[in-house]
Amino acid sequence: MAGQISETDQIKQFKEFLGTYNKITENCFMDCIRDFTTREVKPEEITCSEHCLQKYLKMTQRISMRFQEYHIQQNEALAAKAGLLSQPR
């Protein structure tokens, strides 16, 4: 069945997602949360956490765009090379 992801691959993707989620959570928590004397989250901690997550999401988006651009360039180069090789001399 084309286009469907196997259960094994779905589990693998979910594990990768959880690993990424846990890493982001830990990094932002370590960077932003400083006061453990109260149960309340301070406004500056909330702001820091939001900025931390936004920064990660923007970075991920930028990397994905660059990765996609790279693959497009590679595919174009391969297509051009294949076109040159298939032309009669």
Swiss-Prot record:
Any GO BP:
protein transport
Q: Where in the cell is it found?
A: Mitochondrion inner membrane
InterPro entries the UniProt entry points to: Mito_inner_translocase_sub (IPR050673), Tim10-like (IPR004217), Tim10-like_dom_sf (IPR035427)
Q: Which domain of life is it from?
A: Eukaryota
Q: How does it sit in the membrane?
A: Peripheral membrane protein
Question: Mainly resides where?
Answer: mitochondrion
For this record, the Gene Ontology CC terms, alphabetical, are:
mitochondrial inner membrane
Signal peptide stretch: none
Q: What does this protein do?
A: Mitochondrial intermembrane chaperone that participates in the import and insertion of multi-pass transmembrane proteins into the mitochondrial inner membrane. May also be required for the transfer of beta-barrel precursors from the TOM complex to the sorting and assembly machinery (SAM complex) of the outer membrane. Acts as a chaperone-like protein that protects the hydrophobic precursors from aggregation and guide them through the mitochondrial intermembrane space.
Give the family from UniProt. Belongs to the small Tim family.
Protein's recorded name: Mitochondrial import inner membrane translocase subunit Tim9
Give the source species: Gallus gallus
